[in-house]
């Protein structure tokens, strides 16, 4: 629920369906709940986590009926009742944004850190759905800001992913907020904010030391968040940060064809000559992906068109193997060696033919590729041509 709604809900003006009930009204509502439950049981179509299958207290909380909730608690209803998903009345009150019920349940001893079957606490629900006023209330009552669900996500992860800046501020101000805590995939709140392009949250996390700038920069590049890249670089992120296989941020962006991101990185000093653990440069990655605009940009910035990876393959090899005819043509225009011998002495023409890319092979032949050069096993590209032509005719 947006933060802008929370003040209206807690201003003393009842929202529809949340008015206090008289004792008579409560009894009438209780009978209605009985009828609804009986109808649901008779239908047999509702699961254990749907309102129709809940007990009276959970249903009353879901509908925001403060008077009925009060009566049920007086009659001995358990404040720790659970639905089929393991959620307590407090979870549901937070989820629905019923601030007055959140207060009431806490006053009646509801466990502020109770976790459902997915490991989510009421504070997780507040970070995802609820008004910021609810989060403040939960935190004042000692809700653990660093609680993790089964996926390893804290409330801060959720709030950051959604760009809920005010909520993030509340969570960062709490004891042990865990801004550097990583989830099951190794992502911090900063990673989630970068993936979603949540600029205000990124600024806030950066000011609080909650962002691992190198890996967050990689996420921003993979997600195509050019504005986030600029912010992170301004905060001191290393422009040539590397991922687990040694690819630089520029390499990641190039492999995905993110030209705008690449421009930002190059303007901030990214080195196009750096390679990953396999010896592949950003140009290798762009060529392999068939990203013509990325290839053109890197070539214009001086990327070496004949650089070889650990298998001896050049960007032209990668383009030919993928059948990326426009990229192949552009690399040739930039002076790429057409008969470069790579792994097993294979040329770009060998790879184009082996992988069934007739048009690319024809382009290479028209530009002077030799059909008679042999691989280490003695194979010539021209020997593959009849088979390739046969495949094309069949298709």
From Swiss-Prot:
InterPro entries recorded: Ankyrin_rpt, Ankyrin_rpt-contain_sf
Keyword set, alphabetical order: ANK repeat, Repeat
Leader sequence segment: none
Transmembrane annotation, as ranges: none
A Pfam family matched in the record: Ank
ANK repeat residue intervals: 52-81, 85-114, 118-147, 151-180, 185-212, 213-241, 245-274, 278-307, 311-340, 344-373
Residue runs in coiled coils: none
Keyword Repeat among UniProt keywords: yes
Protein name: Ankyrin repeat domain-containing protein 65
Gene for this chain: ANKRD65
């Amino acid at each position: 629920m947006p933060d802008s709604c929370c003040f209206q809900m807690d201003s003393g003006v009842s929202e529809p369906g949340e008015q206090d009930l008289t004792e008579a009204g409560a009894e009438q509502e209780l009978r209605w709940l009985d009828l609804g439950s009986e109808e649901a049981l008779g239908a047999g179509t509702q699961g254990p986590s749907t309102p129709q299958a809940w007990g009276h207290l959970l249903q009353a909380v879901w509908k925001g009926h403060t008077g009925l909730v009060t009566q049920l608690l007086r009659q001995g209803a358990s404040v720790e009742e659970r639905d089929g998903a393991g959620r307590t009345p407090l979870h549901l009150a937070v989820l629905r944004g019923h601030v007055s019920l959140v207060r009431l349940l806490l006053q009646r001893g509801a466990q502020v850190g109770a976790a459902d079957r997915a490991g989510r606490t009421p504070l997780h629900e507040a970070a995802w759905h609820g008004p910021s006023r609810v989060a403040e209330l939960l935190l004042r009552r000692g809700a653990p800001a660093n609680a993790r669900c089964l996926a390893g996500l804290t409330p801060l992860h959720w709030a950051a992913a959604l760009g809920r800046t005010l909520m993030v501020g509340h969570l960062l101000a709490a004891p042990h907020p865990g801004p550097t805590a990583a989830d099951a995939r190794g992502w911090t709140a900063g990673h989630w904010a970068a993936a979603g392009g949540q600029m205000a949250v990124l600024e806030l996390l950066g000011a609080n030391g909650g962002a691992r700038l190198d890996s967050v920069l990689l996420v921003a590049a993979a997600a195509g968040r050019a504005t986030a890249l600029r912010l992170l670089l301004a905060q001191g992120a290393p422009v040539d940060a590397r991922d687990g296989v040694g690819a630089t941020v520029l390499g990641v962006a190039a492999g995905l064809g993110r030209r705008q991101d690449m421009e930002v990185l190059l303007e901030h000093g990214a080195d196009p000559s750096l390679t990953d653990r396999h010896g592949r440069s950003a140009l290798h990655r762009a060529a392999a992906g068939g990203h013509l605009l990325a290839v053109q940009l890197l070539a214009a910035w001086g990327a070496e068109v004949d650089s070889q990876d650990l298998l001896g393959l050049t960007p032209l090899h990668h383009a030919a193997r993928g059948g990326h005819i426009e990229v192949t043509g552009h690399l040739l225009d930039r002076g790429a060696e057409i008969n470069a011998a790579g792994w097993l002495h294979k040329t770009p023409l060998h790879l184009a033919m082996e992988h069934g890319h007739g048009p690319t092979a024809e382009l290479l032949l028209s530009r002077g590729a030799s059909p008679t050069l042999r691989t280490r096993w003695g194979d010539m590209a021209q020997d593959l041509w009849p088979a390739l032509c046969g495949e094309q005719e069949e298709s």
